[in-house]
Structure formats: C-alpha cells, structure tokens
Amino acid sequence: MPDMPAAILGLILSLLLPGGRFNAYFTPAFTDAAYQKEAAAKVLKAWKPPASQPTGKKTVLIAQIAKDGTLAGLRDHLMTGAKSWDDAAIAAVRHAAPFAPLPKSWGFPTMEVHFHFEVAAK
C-alpha cells in the first residue's frame, strides 16, 4: 500500500456560520475541488447551531473518509469545552456521512479532512 500524503492540509472552504465560521481543510494531494466542496457543503448543511455558544473558541474534528464515502473515523483534535457546541459539531459531521465515494484516481484507502467550527469572538 502506498504511503499517505503528508498531513499538511489545504483550505478548501471557509464560510460563515450562525455565530461563527466553518473551515474545511483537505489533504493537499487530494485535488478534486468539486468533491471537496460537496463534502464540506454536506457538513455545513447538517450544522445545527446550539442555543448557547462559547466565545472566541473552536472545535476541530479530524475525519477519515473511506473509499466508499463512509466515515471511517472521527476524532476530536480541539474542543471548546462547551458541550453543546462540541456535540453540535460532531453531530454535523456524523449526519453528513456518508459522503460521495472517493474518486477512483485517489490511490489511498482513506482521505483525511479537518473540519473547524469557530465561534465568533464577542
């Protein structure tokens, strides 16, 4: 099996959320912009902002998308400490899955993407 590309990630999408900002970072070797936009849009569509929001913090989740588009893994990298915000971010990624199958040209079993859910500073 070939080695995975370096974990340096490239920003593909940055959008405003109610009360904050959403960023999606994909492995740079994964250059299918249409797929990236579609995957990020699915997460954003599944986002349900909580009533209470922490100030000036962010949740960072690292997802592994399998060849068939299923969520092969999801782990937290950084949490705000505000359970409602962190849980809403996790739920958005889980509800967005499954994603479209990875392109046949992608020569790895999974693709990594980091989803950032930032709370606006007040």
Whereabouts are the PLM-identified features?
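Intrinsic-disorder/low-complexity signature in envelope-associated proteins
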Residues: 1, 5-8, 13-38, 48, ...
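Conserved "boundary/linchpin" sites in short secondary-structure elements
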Residues: 17-26, 40-48, 64-78, 87-101, ...
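Short, small/polar residue-rich loop motifs at catalytic or cofactor-binding pockets
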Residues: 54-60
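Residues that form or flank phosphate/diphosphate-binding pockets in enzymes
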Residues: 84
